[in-house]
Amino acid sequence: MYFVVVATHKEEMRQERARLQDAFAAYIHDLTHHPDVTVHHGGQTLSERDKTVTGFVLVLEAPSIEVAQEFVDGSPYARAGTFAESHVCPWNWLTGRPG
């Protein structure tokens, strides 16, 4: 199943988010942490005003929403409490789908 993750960081956690950026990138690319989850696409969301990072969007493939949520909850950002909010939603991928 495919899922979309939309997460927004707390504004007051900007420095902590920046400090953890490399750890988060390593986490989503290292399959040993999450062998059942594949990250197909991802990127940062930006403020319209000054283009600072406000959060991120990921497209995941996982066997269930519970596994996808565990992946998000195990991330360096989640463990550090940087999220103002995060949502994992099932996604019906229609265009640009691999395979």
Question: What are the language-model segments listed below?
Answer:
Residues 1-99:
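Conserved, structured core segments of small domains
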